[in-house]
Amino acid sequence: MSRVCQVTGKRPMVGNNVSHANNKTRRRFLPNLHNHRFWVESENRFVRLRVSTKGMRIIDKLGIDKVLVDLRAQGQKV
């Protein structure tokens, strides 16, 4: 399972750990992903999505129905 938010498309980024002595080592910044079940009233069922916390806020703002329409338009099976 890839580390990608299904709503926002956030992916891991790469950067550096920087020590006090200014030594740099490569690291990954991972998105804050959660497997979350959302109740879809119109379909009378739960939908499981892998979303970041930013994606959860977008779902709270727009509603799960609008987000699912957008995901299905992109070709994701939900």
Curated annotation (Swiss-Prot):
Superkingdom: Bacteria
Keyword annotations of the record: Ribonucleoprotein, Ribosomal protein
Biological processes, Gene Ontology terms: translation
Keyword Ribonucleoprotein: yes
InterPro entries per the UniProt record, alphabetical: Ribosomal_bL28, Ribosomal_bL28/bL31-like_sf, Ribosomal_bL28_bact-type, Ribosomal_bL28_sf
Gene Ontology CC terms, in alphabetical order: cytosolic large ribosomal subunit
Disulfide bond entries: none
GO MF annotation terms: structural constituent of ribosome
UniProt key word Protein transport: no
Family according to the record: Belongs to the bacterial ribosomal protein bL28 family.
Protein name as it appears in the record: Large ribosomal subunit protein bL28
Organism encoding this protein: Psychrobacter arcticus (strain DSM 17307 / VKM B-2377 / 273-4)
Gene behind this protein: rpmB
